């Protein structure tokens, strides 16, 4: 246990001895240490960093980054320099944050004491080693004394006592103290040793023992590499002492750490952010003089700049975030501290919080107790925290009590930075803080003295994230750090006080009033939103984690109050006050490697900005953030973030800007009065968190809780921290009510902060509030922390502005759910994606996550399993990522509006928990998400296992293969995960003919990244089923069409795994999904759309988002799994056995995204899969939405027009609108196209409408009908109208008949692949762009489906996705091919008749799949789930790399039996024998073609590639039953007209509706035909003219006579069509009109349709002659009207006869004729007759 005599810094464990692995402080090298600090301060960067930290932490050393609102994460991917060193250097400068003032008592005293710049290396901050040493010595002595020493030290730190003078013992006492706390923390941080001191240390602390050099007494269980005394809140108060210790420690740190860091940087390529000093690589250097803290972007995801001074400890946080602490924030106080630091480097409040929480907690942890005397308590608490997150609450309470005392004693404005070392031990995150120990020493042994570091001034400088290689960095955005910096310190300390566990309830009460006030004031000052968040991890993970940390949660809320939402978590954004990095399982789950978006959460969530930010925080400080673009794979994602921010502005109005993690800024001052209660409440909040969390589901409860909070007049912990600024009695809480619900609960405790019962009530209320709070204005992350989370949530819920509106609790709850909604879903997904991390975190907190608000958080996280962690930087196409992000962020934005109230509520559950996590130090959240995800080894392992079956991002983030595109819901292609390590792959398995096997590819979404072919698929499906439990998948997903079709989707959802793994939170998880669903509903506007899956992360990985607004699968996992397993195991196994003929396609992730999905399905997919439009093809948002987002709604009709909006738009709404519009148009207009396109809806709606109208009006109508019977003309008119109306109804009915089951767009996801089986291994049709196989769907055995295997190679897949995008932007139409699901899969060569079977077949086995998986991962590390396109591309690439070919596979409902080219070729003899019949059939086919093309026009789509081989023929019978090729005759007969389908939109042009003003200016000199793109406008018309020749067995006139196009030909130059039938002349006229060389004179496709209708059923030659001889227009009209009346009557008679003919039935021609006659008018007839006559 004793340290060796000589301290040799360990290369890989800075701060630890390479011989004894003990912290340097334990080596009795006080003289050197003391000297070193000063030296470092002056000379070394690390020293400076340390000094800065010391300066900041003047009483509570806090990482400089924590001081300033800083980018919590440094992009792991640095563009040019992969070295972290450069990044660190930049960070050093960044470290120059405003000194964070420690408000030991949370009074301004402390805060104001050390407003010095951290940069004033020992001097400004009392940086001098002597003061610190004194503090350390005192601490050491006091530590030796156990409580007394610690208490004294704390007092000294607080400035309450003259203990600092005890410098005589400086070396010994200081060293002892350092060894005990500072050392432990320092070392733990430096060494990257698990910050057992912090939180997990509670458990892990047992393993480590920090002993004072002169004593055998174990002062701490935490030996942190960077466990600097300055980091402990106790020491913080005594800046000098701490700084002495720090410097002393830092000396070693500077030398060893610097070297170690350098080595790490060089050797690992991903340096841990140790506390790099200004000259040493220190990531955070704080200089008061500098305006910005510059944080270098790192190449490694671990290398992130934490708001907290970034030490290796932070890196360790990344690696070993204690799950317990993280989740439970049991290190709540510690985490608070850390969070504060992380949240806003400049937020003293955060430090304070951290000091209190972290220091007291860490003290407890490190010391095994608050003081050496309480090691058991600490450990117990730590354990409890880890188990329940409640113990953390206790610790926090202790911390709070300490803080209360300290605060009361010392209102120093120290910039001491509390360097908390978060370490993951046993899957738990431990926060190590040295300060806490000293504080603990000062306070009673049983009590942790929490010293709150409250930055009095908004000195904290905004953080700039800059790549050390600046050329690589580009200014990205402005982040407002002012709020975070100002209010950071306020909320936390108070929370600490109130959350002080019963251990120090008395202290807590004493502390709360004044301290809280001071803190609150400060909190109000500090409003910082994390500059950037991992779109995926932060949002997704924070809420979950926060809620999970129910026990520690209460502490977190205070921190949350101060800190903005965690940078990494959009949810955090909503935190009203400072961002406190929250150790949320989600965040920790997300592993950030250097491969993960530059080690940053997928993107920096940029506080969007000035307007919103200004609104959110009155004292907003705009911090230009320079982000290394290279750090992010997709800037598009950033764009989406920015765009989201725009939306966020709305959210920000509530101040809980949901747009970003950082956005949550709440006025700390308002929370002032509730802070004490918050402190008191927090511990119980944790306890209640569990109970309340379960309750949380009911809105009533939320309201009650909220009301209770309001009644109590106390803000939730979040608010509490805000209230801290003002007196605890402040009623500002009401303003913060949303956040105040929890606050209120805790607030009531504030008055009796020491009264646990009150706290319990507060906790219960908070929990209830959390459960029921509609996300105030902040994402409901607080619930996860329970009281703390609750308060945090409320804080987040109520942004700074919201603080003033405290009185409006419900509005704040409405806090933009969008942020959290997407974030929640994203977070939830991230959690599930990083299932193991989440599960661990949640589990570590014990069942607490499940039982408590933390559980809520977990639950919500689970319910909305965060989308897979942000996919590796090369996630998915920027477009896809941006879409996801936009979705997430738009969702975040939406929550701002009261409209999201319900949504907010739901979000509150999921997001609220997230918020709780965010509310906890939001920054910590970021860290958590970064660190934790990265750090939790257990989680990582689990995640890895899970990831084995999932795509793994470059950063190690598991890109859960959520059904990549919601569209890929069909299981016949199974994406299975044979092993956890296997990637999902879609295996096409088919039986030769029905026997050989069905093409069954079970696409288990996320589970089977590496699954091997069939076995893997089968295994994967099973695994996925097992891994993704139904509980994980919300029922909502099931409700979605997609999820309905394939409940399996959710199984693939990473979130599902998370929920599943977190067995404890399974039950809670389901409710959160509901809540989340509600959120999503609000976001998506379609409740069904809210899919439980947070697909945002899956493909986007960053949208986390966000992006993502994908939600966690709502379907019960079981259902989904079952669906996946449905045909998967049996069929796949069978197929494997029967594979011989058609080897199963290597399982590959199939992009369902590109395939049309019913909107409901699509949304479900979006939510669950977060599927985005194929990234490869950045098409219209419609495309993305429809392919990625419209997975839910089958009705792309309505949706398609706005398919791009489908992601956010309720599918139901969309569909009805188009149908209404279409039906109206078709009724009102003659356009058959409208009737066709909306025929189904038109039928149902019109039929319902007109039919009902007729019924309702029938009696009056009958009366009217019988009037005027004496007037013949009147009677004739009535008969005419009756026939017309009847025909219209019949036409609509026919549409319903022929479009039966096809009006709703299907979106089959990967989960549905297992349910598909190829019925034959022989293609039913080979078209120009693909080959079609018939398939059966197990869930719809009566319907036939076709599997379309695109011929395009992987490189050309983008073209296909473009085609999909275009198609999905269109509503369903009878003559336009529908994609029911699209995937990228490895297809056996035998299924590719056009390819050489040798090469592809080799890759048909499962090994290829695994290879594919690996390749997919390699493919840029983009998580396939992120963007369907990307995954497909990946898969394509993989396939290409492998011997198998990767092809886009699409499921369609229309089973083509031949192409028009085949039909024309086979009908040559028929044309000669029966020209009339054949040419009539040609007219019918051309009419359908024109109808389909006309359908494209309103959507500005031009096919541009009309060829006979791209037109498919489907044998169609009324009722929508498509006949297979076998029953169909190669040559369709007139008796059974064939349905024509337009396919292959790869060359389609779609004009964007969005006009860029710049483009408009540029177009001022362009010709109209160019501007209007007229060159494409009538391209289809021209190509249709060519098709007329080709269908009549004539050559293309321009092929035969190329000079025609070269010269200005005229219609007369075109070849003549032989007059073989009555239709020949009309076709000639039509062809000449369509081939008019002048586009302006070329007839429209609608006119061409009218001509064809006229040729088929219109007036004949005899009528034309009479028509021409008619003298007047009236005569002509009368003539046409009479003809029309007769034709309508005849058709009515025909329908009547066919209705009696049981065998006959209505034919396709009858329907087409009915459309014509029902909507024809004399004017339209006259117009067509004129065209035919005069052209």
Curated annotation (Swiss-Prot):
SUPFAM superfamilies reported in the protein's UniProt record: Protein kinase-like (PK-like) (SSF56112)
Domain Protein kinase: 1302-1664
Keywords from the UniProt entry: Cell junction, Cytoplasm, Cytoskeleton, Phosphoprotein
Modification Phosphoserine, positions: 282, 537, 569, 584, 645, 824-825, 897, 1363
Gene Ontology terms: biological process: cell migration; focal adhesion assembly; regulation of focal adhesion assembly; substrate adhesion-dependent cell spreading
Main location: cytoplasm
GO MF, any single term: identical protein binding
Region (Required for homodimerization) residue spans: 1274-1300, 1659-1732
Basic and acidic residues bias (residue ranges): 902-919, 1037-1055
Pro residues: bias regions: 864-873
Keyword Kinase on entry: no
PTM text: Phosphorylated on tyrosine in a CSK-dependent manner in response to adhesion to fibronectin and to EGF stimulation. Phosphorylation at Tyr-662 by a Src family kinase controls subcellular localization to focal adhesion and focal adhesion dynamics. Phosphorylation at Tyr-1177 is essential for binding to SHC1. Phosphorylation at Tyr-632 promotes interaction with tensin TNS3.
Listed Acidic residues bias regions: 1076-1086
Annotated compartments: Cytoplasm, Cytoskeleton; Cell junction, Focal adhesion
InterPro entries: Kinase-like_dom_sf, MitoQC_Scaffold_Kinases, Prot_kinase_dom, Tyr_kinase_AS
GO CC annotations on file: actin cytoskeleton; cytosol; focal adhesion
Ranges of biased composition (kind: Low complexity): 325-336, 367-378, 498-509, 847-863
Phosphotyrosine PTM positions: 632, 638, 662, 1177
Subunit structure as annotated in this protein's UniProt entry: Homodimer. Interacts with BCAR1 and CRK. Interacts with PRAG1. Interacts (when phosphorylated at Tyr-1177) with SHC1 (via PID domain). Found in a complex with PPP1CA, PPP1CC and SHC1. Interacts (when phosphorylated at Tyr-632) with tensin TNS3 (when phosphorylated on the SH2 domain); TNS3 also interacts with integrins ITGB1, ITGB3 and ITGB5 and mediates their association with PEAK1.
Function in brief: Probable catalytically inactive kinase. Scaffolding protein that regulates the cytoskeleton to control cell spreading and migration by modulating focal adhesion dynamics. Acts as a scaffold for mediating EGFR signaling.
Family statement drawn from the similarity comment of this UniProt entry: Belongs to the protein kinase superfamily.
PANTHER family for this protein: INACTIVE TYROSINE-PROTEIN KINASE PEAK1 (PTHR22972:SF5), SERINE/THREONINE PROTEIN KINASE (PTHR22972)
Record's comment describing the protein's domains: The dimerization region encompasses helices both from the N- and C-terminal of the protein kinase domain.
Annotated protein name in UniProt: Inactive tyrosine-protein kinase PEAK1
Protein source organism: Mus musculus (Mouse)
Upper taxonomic lineage: Eukaryota, Metazoa, Chordata, Craniata, Vertebrata
Gene name of this polypeptide: Peak1
